[in-house]
């Protein structure tokens, strides 16, 4: 009796277990297969993204490592203190003339571009935002930003070197460089000022302030981090230009002594020309110039971050 009772109980338990188990429908199978397909697609996209990132960053990081490593190992005190010696296929010495020429060209170009760019950005953002003149300025700036740098260099050659008779000089090269940097500064200045809320301007005007006071004491302070970032970005871009300076500044092994009728040396020329010369000394100077350019650009970017954080806390 007990045996039959246990057999019947086990049969009932087994039947209940079979009944309680859910049956797998075609919908469940479709959902499962769709989930597996999505996971497979997600893995494929992630793998493809990683491959693309590596394909882009590996050549760039390899070049940076080569320039930084070779330049840092070759650079010495004489690189900064001695000018370049020789010409044509044989060169030696240091890069004092190119370093001073680069700083002089950047000083002239950035001074003109910053003054005109910031004032132009303030005008079209604060005083004439929707006027026809502002729209014309924006259109001209966009067109100027799209002009190749070598075309700007040739125009500078015809206008400054030939027509005005300045010759190959620091002033001709610096002004040509300022035309190249100007669009970046004016557009970033306008964008930085536009990010300031209109409520701030309206509150200041409600207290009796005029437009000039609002701009000088309020909106410029709020937009200063963005303006500084745009200025340093334009300087970094101008630092890497060679084509405009080939037509307007030429190159010289001597430290610049005058703003007119005096060719100027600069680091990008050393990288562009000396790397194609057959001598090992020329290649050494090219690597050292590359290292100095990278160091200056990194310093400018670091300074931009520090200044932006500092002025952001102040405002």
Predicted regions, residues:
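Transmembrane alpha-helical segments of polytopic membrane transport and secretion proteins
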Residues: 2-55, 304-315
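Interhelical loop and adjacent transmembrane-helix boundary motif
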Residues: 87, 245-294
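Transmembrane alpha-helix signature in integral membrane proteins
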Residues: 93-123, 231
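Transmembrane-helix boundary motif in ABC transporter permease subunits
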Residues: 109-141, 154, 162, 305-310
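C-terminal transmembrane helix and the adjacent membrane-cytosol boundary/short C-terminal tail
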Residues: 124, 191-194, 205, 232, ...
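Generic hydrophobic transmembrane alpha-helix motif, especially the helices
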Residues: 142-179
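Glycine/proline-centered hinge or cleavage motifs at structural transition points of membrane proteins
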Residues: 148, 207-208, 221
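Transmembrane alpha-helices
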Residues: 211-248
